[in-house]
Structures are given as C-alpha cells and as structure tokens.
C-alpha cells in the first residue's frame, strides 16, 4: 500500500558532510509517525526535505502522490519549524491573520480557524499582545497554531512540545490524536520517548541513517524491553 508520504533512497550532504544516507519511509494516511534521535542526527533536515524547503541530493520524495518540492503542496502541508518564524512587531492575532491569508480560505473560514487554533494552544487571551513580548513557550504555541491554520492534510511538527508545560503538552497530543482520527497524516520529531510511544510508527535516526523502524509495541517486543528508552539504546548498540 502506497503512503501519503514516501521517501525513497534519499541522501543529503552539506559540503563534504553526509547528513542523511539512503533514507526510506512510507507513511500511511491517518498515521502519526515519530522521528526520534539525538540533536544533529538529521531529523530536521529530513522534515525540511519532505516539506520542500530543502532538496535531496539523491532519491525521491512524494507527498500526496506529488513529487516535492512543489509550491502548490504547501496549501496542504502544515509545518512547524524548530525555530519560530514569527513577526515580533505584530500581535499574535496579526500573525495568525497574516498566515491565514496565505491560504485558500474565505474570511469566515479564516476567522473560524484563528479561533480554533488559538484556543487549542491556549493563547486566546494573549492574541492582542505583541509577539516580541511572548515567552519562548508562547512563541512555540503560536507556531503550532500557525501550522494548523489552514486545516492541512499533512502536518509536520519539528519538536512541537519543547518549552511547553506538561498539561498543555497532553492537550496538544490529545488534539493530534483527534486529527489522526480525521485522517490527517502527521510527522512529529521528538526527543521525548513517552511522546514517541503515542505514535503509530517510529523511525529511529542516528548518524544520518534510520537504525530501526516499527510500531512502539513491536519494537519493545523485538528488543525484549518494557521501556522505550531501552529500545533506542539497544538499537544504537546494534548499529555499532
């Protein structure tokens, strides 16, 4: 069965440094797929290529049966980067209005999506403040709202819960599970193993390669462990 997102034999270098090598992914519609690994493992580079912000040196990437990069696909992809791309001199509401205006939403849809996303990330009472006054956690929450503003078919979130308090993290994950139920396809990069365990499938990335893939429960059974951290440790030792 072909997936909503297909990555086939993808490699990427920056100068002489090989960042990703021979990456394969097949992510099905309505799945949450976790990319886990240490900083510098290549997770962010991979999601940027899936979005179409970077191009691979070798291999092919398809999203919704279209080869990336493709400008029209951005209407269907919600992307939250690791570093917040926000306008500090504007208010939270003005940021949401600006990004909503980039998509094919009528005025009524824009208003509804702004209300929904602001409430989801618990910023509805902070929207009149300038983003320059926001804390780091508030900026992450606004970035997440922007990633969801156009009701995208594909949602790609790079470390979405960094700097967010535990209660809101639970709320965000509950919403991701609801979106999954609507048939949205979601990629999440994370260092947090408890979050990885909520994914349908995970790919463990280390030194530019995928060292293990599978469902969280399947991987725990394979390595005969109860703790998902131990899966990553054992898979890493196997690579060496």
Task: State where each predicted segment sits.
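Conserved ABC ATPase "signature" region
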Residues: 97, 101, 108-126
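ABC ATPase "signature
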Residues: 213-214
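Conserved ABC transporter NBD signature motif
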Residues: 59-75
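Helix-to-loop junction immediately C-terminal to a conserved catalytic motif
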Residues: 51
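Catalytic Walker B motif of ABC-type/P-loop ATPase nucleotide-binding domains
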Residues: 155-159
């Amino acid at each position: 069965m072909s997936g909503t997102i297909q990555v086939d034999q993808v490699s990427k270098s920056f100068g002489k440094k090989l960042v990703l090598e021979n990456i394969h992914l097949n992510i099905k519609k309505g799945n949450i797929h976790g990319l886990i690994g240490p900083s510098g493992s290549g997770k962010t580079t991979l999601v940027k290529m899936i979005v179409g912000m970077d191009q691979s040196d070798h291999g092919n990437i398809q999203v919704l049966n279209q080869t990336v990069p493709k400008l029209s696909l951005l209407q269907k992809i919600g992307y939250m980067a690791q570093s917040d791309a926000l306008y500090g001199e504007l208010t939270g509401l003005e940021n949401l209005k600006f990004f909503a205006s980039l998509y094919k939403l009528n005025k009524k849809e824009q208003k509804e999506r702004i209300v929904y996303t602001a409430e989801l990330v618990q910023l509805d009472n902070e929207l009149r403040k300038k983003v320059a006054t926001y804390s780091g956690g508030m900026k992450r929450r606004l970035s997440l709202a922007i990633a969801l503003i156009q009701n995208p078919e594909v949602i790609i979130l790079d470390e979405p819960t960094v700097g967010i308090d535990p209660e809101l993290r639970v709320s965000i994950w509950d919403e991701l599970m609801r979106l999954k139920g609507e048939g949205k396809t979601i990629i999440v990069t994370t260092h947090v193993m408890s979050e990885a365990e909520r994914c349908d499938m995970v790919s463990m990335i280390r030194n530019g390669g995928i060292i293990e893939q599978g469902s969280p429960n399947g991987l725990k059974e394979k390595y005969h462990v109860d703790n998902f951290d131990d899966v990553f440790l054992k898979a890493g030792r196997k690579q060496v």
